[in-house]
Amino acid sequence: MNDSVKTSLKRTLVGKVVSNKMDKTVTVLVEHRVKHPIYGKYVVRSKKYHAHDDANTYNEGDLVEIQETRPISKTKAWVVARLVEAARVI
């Protein structure tokens, strides 16, 4: 038998939680840098994703990793996989 470790083929992204006002849902802002095709300057592009947070544990400012999953609702097809870094409380 072959004892190989299964790896997840689902996409994962890292972003910042910008809203946790919905029940069991967080809004995650994912930013990435893209080089402008003509000018060559690096520009920051961003997109917001709704991710499933079953226990309502993540707060605004947390850095989280989200993973693609089956559609949970009309706008939600991602689930929070893990907490990368907690938000600083001042």
From Swiss-Prot:
One of its GO terms (biological process) is translation. Disulfide bonds: none annotated. InterPro entries: NA-bd_OB-fold (IPR012340), Ribosomal_uS17 (IPR000266), Ribosomal_uS17_bact/chlr (IPR019984), Ribosomal_uS17_CS (IPR019979). The keyword Lyase does not apply. The keyword NADP does not apply. Gene3D superfamilies: Nucleic acid-binding proteins. Signal peptide: none annotated. Part of the 30S ribosomal subunit. One of the primary rRNA binding proteins, it binds specifically to the 5'-end of 16S ribosomal RNA. This is Small ribosomal subunit protein uS17. It comes from Paraburkholderia xenovorans (strain LB400). The lineage of its organism: Bacteria, Pseudomonadati, Pseudomonadota, Betaproteobacteria, Burkholderiales.
